[in-house]
Regions:
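Conserved acidic donor-binding segment of nucleotide-sugar-dependent glycosyltransferases
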Residues: 253, 284-290, 299-304
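A charged, aromatic-enriched C-terminal amphipathic alpha-helix characteristic of glycosyltransferases
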Residues: 302-335
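A cross-kingdom feature marking charged/low-complexity
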Residues: 339-344
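Short amphipathic alpha-helix in glycosyltransferases
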Residues: 97, 175, 284, 298, ...
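Nucleotide-sugar donor-binding catalytic core of glycosyltransferases
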Residues: 1-47, 54-65, 69, 77-85, ...
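Acidic (Asp/Glu)-rich catalytic clusters
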Residues: 89-92
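A short, histidine- and acid-enriched strand-loop-helix "catalytic/donor-clamping" loop
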Residues: 98-111
Length: 344
């Protein structure tokens, strides 16, 4: 099936587009960022204004590119730049239009970023949403159809692999966290440091943390966006922290799936969804606060056989859970086509 895929041609968006290709679809990637420019100012403008003026830049070229692809389905990744005018015009193709978002467009963390998404929401055939609570909110805003999906790992990007010894030495760590700074994360990290946890952090914006002076010695570098280096950092750590975004009201995140899929040991906040995903103490370890997290980490670092056993069992559970891109996307496409009455 021909699919016009609107989304970045990099990162996890590219993972999803590639997974659609592995499922046998003919995918044309149409990246809105090409017409906006890849600049931090684009993201800041979206955050503050909801993308005011973006439609004038992207509507015509994106519409032209989609029509040229002659799709049987349009797949929109995130969709924060696509407003109702563009969606109405895309609707003239008379094919299902699907939106997948792994952020929370109904929370306040991202400012005005998802203004256009919310305005255009009723024009999608199907929304694939990563949070249960968002389903009711989407319906309230006029969604035609919405389905809840779990976060996913990618079959290729997040498969276990051997790491070059030099690369492994570069990323070697006792307890690692890979992720962007958020206000609640600074105090958490400082508490771990104060309790003697040997911590390594990779991620952007940590210099903004009020606690930066204490965190700086443990910051190993900016965010890791290369698939092989991300895998190396996970597999070179004895314990991998999976922190949630309070502003996004997370109960699990992509890290919750990716870390065990790669074969790393997941150490994350105890939530209802994490407890569904993994058996505590056997397939992953959980905590309620920094104090418990520090105690759990120290215990595991002193018991290597137990640490290896949990990492191994967590990987096996991740495979059984099957929260990977290909089955998730296959289910989304099937529902969209069936719901649209256009199975072909």
């Amino acid at each position: 099936m021909r699919i016009a895929y609107s989304g970045p041609g990099q990162g996890t968006s590219l993972h999803r587009a590639s997974a659609l290709k592995r499922l046998g679809h003919e995918v044309t990637i149409i990246d809105p960022w090409e017409w906006l420019g890849r600049s931090k100012w684009v993201s800041r403008w979206a955050w503050h204004t909801g993308g005011l003026g973006f439609e004038m830049r992207i509507n015509r070229p994106l519409l032209t590119a989609v029509f040229a692809a002659r799709p049987a389905l349009i797949f929109v990744n995130q969709g924060e730049f696509l407003g109702p005018v563009l969606l109405r015009r895309l609707g003239s193709l008379n094919v299902p239009i699907v939106n997948y978002t792994n952020d929370n467009p109904f929370a306040g963390r991202d400012g005005m970023r998802f203004r256009l998404y919310r305005d255009a929401l009723p024009r999608y055939s199907l929304l694939a949403i990563a949070r249960e609570e968002s389903l009711a909110l989407a319906k309230r805003l006029g969604a035609r159809d919405a389905m809840r999906v779990w976060y996913t790992a990618d079959e290729k990007a997040h498969r276990p692999r051997l790491i070059d010894p030099e690369v492994q030495e570069h990323y070697a760590s006792e307890v690692s966290f890979i992720g962007t700074w958020m206000p609640e994360r600074g105090p958490f990290m400082v508490e771990l440091i104060r309790r003697g946890v040997s911590l390594s952090i990779w991620g952007d914006r940590w210099q903004k943390a009020p606690e930066w002076q204490l965190i700086a010695p443990h910051w190993r570098g900016p965010g890791i966006y290369d698939d092989d280096r991300y895998a190396a950092a996970i597999l070179s750590a004895r314990i991998c922290l999976g922190l949630l975004s309070k502003g996004n009201r997370d109960l699990h995140t992509s890290r919750s799936i990716e870390i065990p899929a790669l074969g790393g040991l997941l150490c994350a906040e105890r939530t209802s969804e994490h407890l569904v995903l993994y058996e505590e103490g056997r397939e992953a370890v959980f905590w309620k606060d920094a104090q418990e997290c520090a105690a759990v980490c120290k215990h595991l670092l002193e018991d290597e056989p137990l640490r290896q056993s949990i990492a191994r069992s967590g990987h096996e559970r991740a495979l059984r859970n099957n929260h990977f891109n290909e089955p998730m996307l296959a289910a989304v496409i099937e529902r969209a086509m069936h719901g649209y009455g256009a199975l072909r």
